C-alpha cells in the first residue's frame, strides 16, 4: 500500500535554508473528531490555540487513524508501522515488541533530550512506549491503582501541562543548547465528559466540546511558554489525535467498535521549524498517521534516520486520489470473538470489509448513512483487491487460547476508562464458519459497557440484569459470568462470585484471570486447599500471572512462610510495583527477622503509596536493626504523624533516639508510650530490643 504523501507545493515552494537543529514537539489530544475543531470548520466550539497553530502550519483535512483505540493508535504514531505489522491491535496483547523502534529512540540516539507526559493508564509505560525517553511521566503504574482511587487512571490537561512545563524548564536550565524531543498527551476529550469551569457552563449540553475547548486552553500555556522562551518559531510541532468519537452515530456511543469516519477521521496539523522553506497550507487528500514518525525525523533534518521507518513522510513524492488510507478494528474480535473490521479510504470512497461489506461516498455522504456496496460492486472489488494485497503481506493469526491475557489490575483500569478488554479464544472452526458481523452485535456490546458502568457505580442489580439479557442472546459469551464474578467479589458476595467464575471456566477453560478470581473468593469461603489449586492452575496456564503468584503466597503464608516468600518474590520479579505485594513480602521478612530484606520491601511499599502507621513502624524497626538510625527516626516519626496514638511507634522512636545519644528526646517518647499503653511503663529502655 502506497502511503499518501504531500507535494512540496502544498506547503508553498521556497528554497530551504540551513537551520539549527530544531526542537521537536509532538502533541496528541485523545479522542478528537476533526469536525469538532475550529480550523476544520466547527462552529460551536472555540479552539484558538489549535486554530493559531493551523495558521502557522499545514492542516491535513483527511487524516485517518489506523485504529480507533488509544494505545494501538499511539503505537502507530510513534513507530510509523501499521497495527498488523507491530502486533498492537487492541488492549489484549503483549507490549510493543522491541524490534519496533520509536521516534523517541531515534531522537535520543541523535543526541536529543527526550521527555514525555501522558495523561492516562492506556499509555502506561508497561505497554512499551516509554523506550527512548529520558523522562516518561505516566503516574498510572499498577502501584497507584492499588493505593489510590480508581479515578486516578487519568488526569486533567492542566496537571499534565504543568508537569510538561516543569520538565521543559528544567531541561532548558540544565542543557540550554541541547535540542529536545517532547511528547505531550492530553486525555480530556475521552469519556466521561467532565470539563472544569468555565467550560462546563459554556458548553452545557455538549460537554464533549467543552473537554476539547479545555484541552485547547491548557495547550495554550505550552504555546505561550514556547513563545516567551523564543523557541516557538524554530520548533517543529505536530499535533494530532489518536482517534475520534462516535457520539451515537451508527449506534456506537464512544469509539473502538466500528471504523466509520466519526472515529477514524482526525485532526493533523504540522508546523515546520523556521527556515524549512515550507509555508502554511491545507491538504485535502487522505493521509495516514503512519506518516507522522518519518515526518518528524525528516523535518528535524534526520533524513537518514527517516529511511528506517517503513512508511513515507508527509513530504515529497506524488500524492493521488488512488493512495488509500488503511484502518482496522480488532476490538470486537479480540474481546468478543466477532469479526474484525478492515477499511480503505480514497479521496471519495470509504470501503469497510465486514461480513456485510460497506461502501460510502464520503464526498456526497459525509455522515456515511447510505451503503453503496450492493450498488457499486466494481468499486468494492477494486478496493477489496487493494486491501487483500496489503493484508496478504501480514496474514492474521488469531489466538486459540485466551489464557495469557492482561493482569487483573490492567483489566480493572481499562474498565474504569470505558474499555472492555479481554482475550476471547477463536477456534479455526469458528473462523471457517464465519464470525458475526459487529453491526449485528451492537446491542450486546452496548449492554456490556452499560453493565460495566453500573458495577463501577455499585449498582449490582442493574449490571446483573443487563448481563442476564446478554447471556440469553449469547449463552457462550464467557465474559458475562466473568464480569458477574468480578462484580460479586467487589460486593463481597463470595458464594455468588464463586459460582460465576466456575461458569466462566466452563465456557473458557483457559482463562487464567477467572482462575485467579476463583482462587481469591475461595479463600474468603474458607476453602484454602481448593483456592491454592486454582492459583496453581492459573500459573500453569500463564506463568506470568503475578496476581496468581500473589494469591498463592497469601494462601501459603498461613502454613509455610518460606514457600510464601518464594511466591511473593516470583510475583515481584514480574511486577515489582504492586504496593500490597511489597508490603506483605516485607512483613514476612520482618517476621523472619530478615530486617535488611524487610526494609527494602516495606520502603518500596511506602514509596508506592502505602501510608499506613504500622507499616512505617515496622520499617523504622527494620532500619534500626540494620543500623540506619536516621532513617529509623524518620520512618517512626512518620508513623506517629499518621497515628499519634500508636504507642509502639513512640516506644521504638525513643529507643532510636537513645541509640543516637539524644536522651531528652528518648525520655519524651518513652513517656508518651507509657501514657498510651501502661504495659510499656514497666519496660527497661536499656533492654529494649
Task: Label every PLM stretch briefly.
Residues 473, 507, 541, 574, ...:
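Structural marker of alpha-solenoid helical repeat scaffolds
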Residues 14, 508, 582, 677-679, ...:
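Extracellular/secretory pathway and lumenal proteins
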Residues 444, 478-479, 512-513, 546-547, ...:
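Helix-start (N-cap) detector for alpha-helical repeat units in TPR-like alpha-solenoids
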Amino acid at each position: 500500500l502506497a502511503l499518501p504523501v504531500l507535494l512540496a507545493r502544498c506547503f508553498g515552494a521556497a528554497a530551504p535554508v540551513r537551520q539549527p537543529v530544531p526542537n521537536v514537539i509532538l502533541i496528541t489530544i485523545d479522542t478528537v473528531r476533526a469536525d469538532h475543531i475550529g480550523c476544520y470548520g466547527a462552529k460551536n466550539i472555540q479552539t484558538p490555540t489549535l486554530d493559531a497553530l493551523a495558521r502557522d502550519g499545514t492542516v491535513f483535512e483527511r487524516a485517518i487513524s489506523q485504529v480507533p483505540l488509544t494505545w494501538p493508535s499511539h503505537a502507530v504514531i510513534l513507530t510509523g508501522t501499521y497495527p498488523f505489522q507491530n502486533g498492537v491491535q487492541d488492549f489484549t496483547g503483549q507490549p510493543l515488541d522491541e524490534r519496533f523502534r520509536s521516534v523517541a529512540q531515534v531522537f535520543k540516539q541523535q543526541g536529543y533530550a527526550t521527555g514525555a507526559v501522558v495523561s492516562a493508564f492506556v499509555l502506561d509505560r508497561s505497554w512499551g512506549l516509554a523506550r527512548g525517553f529520558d523522562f516518561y511521566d505516566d503516574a498510572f503504574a499498577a502501584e497507584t491503582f492499588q493505593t489510590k482511587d480508581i479515578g486516578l487512571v487519568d488526569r486533567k490537561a492542566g496537571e499534565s501541562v504543568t508537569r510538561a512545563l516543569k520538565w521543559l524548564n528544567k531541561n532548558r536550565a540544565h542543557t540550554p543548547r541541547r535540542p529536545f524531543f517532547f511528547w505531550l498527551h492530553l486525555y480530556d476529550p475521552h469519556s466521561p465528559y467532565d470539563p472544569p469551569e468555565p467550560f462546563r457552563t459554556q458548553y452545557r449540553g455538549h460537554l464533549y466540546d467543552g473537554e476539547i475547548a479545555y484541552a485547547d486552553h491548557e495547550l495554550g500555556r505550552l504555546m505561550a511558554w514556547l513563545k516567551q522562551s523564543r523557541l516557538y518559531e524554530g520548533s517543529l510541532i505536530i499535533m494530532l489525535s489518536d482517534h475520534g468519537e462516535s457520539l451515537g452515530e451508527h449506534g456506537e456511543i464512544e469509539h473502538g467498535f466500528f471504523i466509520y469516519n466519526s472515529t477514524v477521521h482526525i485532526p493533523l496539523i504540522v508546523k515546520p521549524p523556521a527556515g524549512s522553506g515550507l509555508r502554511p497550507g491545507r491538504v485535502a487528500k487522505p493521509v495516514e498517521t503512519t506518516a507522522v514518525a518519518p515526518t518528524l525525523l525528516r523535518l528535524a533534518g534526520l533524513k537518514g534516520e527517516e529511511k528506517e521507518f517503513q512508511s513515507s513522510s508527509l513530504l515529497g513524492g506524488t500524492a493521488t486520489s488512488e493512495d488509500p488510507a488503511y484502518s482496522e478494528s480488532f476490538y470486537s474480535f479480540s474481546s468478543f470473538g466477532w469479526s474484525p473490521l478492515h477499511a480503505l479510504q480514497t479521496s471519495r470512497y470509504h470501503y469497510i470489509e465486514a461480513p456485510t461489506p460497506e461502501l460510502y461516498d464520503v464526498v456526497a455522504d459525509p455522515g456515511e448513512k447510505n451503503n453503496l456496496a450492493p450498488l457499486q460492486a466494481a468499486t468494492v472489488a477494486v478496493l477489496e483487491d487493494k486491501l487483500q494485497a496489503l493484508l496478504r503481506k501480514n496474514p492474521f493469526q488469531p489466538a486459540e487460547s485466551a489464557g495469557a491475557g492482561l493482569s487483573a489490575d490492567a483489566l480493572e483500569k481499562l474498565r474504569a476508562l470505558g474499555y472492555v478488554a479481554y482475550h476471547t479464544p477463536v477456534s479455526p472452526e469458528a473462523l471457517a464458519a464465519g464470525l458475526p458481523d459487529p453491526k449485528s452485535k451492537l446491542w450486546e456490546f452496548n449492554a456490556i459497557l452499560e453493565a460495566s458502568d453500573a458495577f463501577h457505580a455499585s449498582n449490582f442489580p442493574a449490571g446483573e440484569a443487563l448481563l442476564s439479557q446478554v447471556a440469553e442472546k449469547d449463552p457462550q459469551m464467557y465474559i458475562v459470568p466473568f464480569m458477574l464474578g468480578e462484580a460479586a467479589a467487589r460486593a463481597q458476595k463470595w458464594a455468588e462470585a464463586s459460582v460465576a467464575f466456575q461458569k466462566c471456566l466452563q465456557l473458557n477453560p483457559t482463562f487464567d484471570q477467572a482462575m485467579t478470581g476463583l482462587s481469591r473468593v475461595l479463600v474468603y469461603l474458607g476453602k484454602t486447599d481448593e483456592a491454592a489449586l486454582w492459583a496453581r492452575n492459573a500459573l500453569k496456564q500463564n506463568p506470568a500471572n503475578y496476581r496468581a503468584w500473589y494469591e498463592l503466597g497469601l494462601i501459603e503464608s498461613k502454613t509455610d512462610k518460606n514457600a510464601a516468600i518464594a511466591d511473593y518474590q516470583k510475583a515481584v520479579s514480574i511486577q515489582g510495583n504492586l504496593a500490597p505485594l511489597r508490603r506483605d513480602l516485607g512483613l514476612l521478612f520482618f517476621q523472619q527477622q530478615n530486617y535488611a530484606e524487610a526494609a527494602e520491601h516495606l520502603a518500596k511499599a511506602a514509596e508506592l503509596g502505602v501510608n499506613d502507621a504500622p507499616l512505617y513502624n515496622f520499617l523504622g524497626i527494620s532500619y534500626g536493626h540494620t543500623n540506619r538510625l536516621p532513617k529509623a527516626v524518620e520512618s517512626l516519626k512518620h508513623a506517629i504523624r499518621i497515628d499519634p496514638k500508636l504507642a509502639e511507634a513512640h516506644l521504638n522512636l525513643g529507643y532510636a533516639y537513645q541509640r543516637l545519644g539524644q536522651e531528652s528526646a528518648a525520655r519524651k517518647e518513652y513517656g508518651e508510650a507509657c501514657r498510651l499503653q501502661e504495659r510499656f511503663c514497666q519496660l527497661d529502655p536499656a533492654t529494649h530490643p
